Amino acid sequence: MDLTPREKDKLQIFTAGLLAERRKARGLRLNYPEAVALITCAILEGARDGNTVAELMSEGRKVLTRADVMEGVPEMIPDIQVEATFPDGTKLVTVHNPIV
């Protein structure tokens, strides 16, 4: 399988997001990389589903709460920026304070 570097990055994000989702489902509190991966994955999948940038900026704040992550993680993530592919092209989605 020949994948571009961008496609490889997306697969790594998806894999990390899937791992984070499983750990969250088991009741584990997520660390920094897991939290970022899960939110990023949700944004990428939302873009693939046809949601708008504005919708994803809002939905990105609903993926995790403080109770879902380890202490100090929300303060480590002031914002997340994801370059996502939409039906009309690639756009940058910025989610400010993604964990509230």
UniProtKB/Swiss-Prot annotation:
<dbReference type="GO" id="GO:0043419">
    <property type="term" value="P:urea catabolic process"/>
</dbReference>
<comment type="pathway">
    <text>Nitrogen metabolism; urea degradation; CO(2) and NH(3) from urea (urease route): step 1/1.</text>
</comment>
<dbReference type="InterPro" id="IPR002026">
    <property type="entry name" value="Urease_gamma/gamma-beta_su"/>
</dbReference>
<keyword id="KW-0378">Hydrolase</keyword>
<dbReference type="Pfam" id="PF00547">
    <property type="entry name" value="Urease_gamma"/>
</dbReference>
<dbReference type="GO" id="GO:0009039">
    <property type="term" value="F:urease activity"/>
</dbReference>
<dbReference type="InterPro" id="IPR012010">
    <property type="entry name" value="Urease_gamma"/>
</dbReference>
<comment type="similarity">
    <text>Belongs to the urease gamma subunit family.</text>
</comment>
<dbReference type="GO" id="GO:0016151">
    <property type="term" value="F:nickel cation binding"/>
</dbReference>
<keyword id="KW-0963">Cytoplasm</keyword>
<comment type="subunit">
    <text>Heterotrimer of UreA (gamma), UreB (beta) and UreC (alpha) subunits. Three heterotrimers associate to form the active enzyme.</text>
</comment>
<dbReference type="InterPro" id="IPR036463">
    <property type="entry name" value="Urease_gamma_sf"/>
</dbReference>
<dbReference type="GO" id="GO:0005737">
    <property type="term" value="C:cytoplasm"/>
</dbReference>
<dbReference type="InterPro" id="IPR050069">
    <property type="entry name" value="Urease_subunit"/>
</dbReference>
<protein>
    <recommendedName>
        <fullName>Urease subunit gamma</fullName>
        <ecNumber>3.5.1.5</ecNumber>
    </recommendedName>
</protein>
